[in-house]
């Protein structure tokens, strides 16, 4: 596992390598009791979860206040935090069991982050969090219009929503309305990967989000913008 990590992730320190190994062990152990990931083979986890999560590293300035919406088993936030402990991260998930897992990971790895159990739609309306982040990450399996409605309201004006995607050429066409309504502009950054097309869609928030968004829980996915 260590050799695999060192071959795959550039500039990996011994301490960070230890943390990735511990994270993998926790992931596989907890996955026997709850559904965290279908990917459990070491090589697959290192490439498709750990290394893939790190694609956003160049776009996160030191110390930026960052939120990971629908973090699930901790991707991309935990790998990013292992490499960049300076990040001020908030991890949001709708399932309490996953939040408990994330808190255990952070404690075991000696990392600091805030974990919140909430639906993304409700979190985006909470005045403590709305329009308060510099960056919003999402690697969740949802269409771009849905991800934008759940992430953009959390950003300060000038902040960036970073969505992890595959081939987005068709999805970008369907996201035009969401980009317009949420006052965003999008840039697609290809990500090098040997397991299929990967990209980051980086959306910059250019004006405050209208009060109507995000809509009530379930609506963004039922009726995408």
Regions from the PLM with identified roles:
Residues 70:
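Conserved glycine-centered beta->alpha loop in an early N-terminal alpha/beta scaffold
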Residues 73-86, 149:
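Conserved SAM-binding loop of SAM-dependent methyltransferases across substrates and taxa
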Residues 20, 24, 50, 77, ...:
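A general structural signal for well-ordered alpha-helical segments in protein cores
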Residues 87-90, 94-225:
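S-adenosylmethionine
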Residues 1-63, 67, 97-100, 104-113:
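Class I SAM-dependent transferase core
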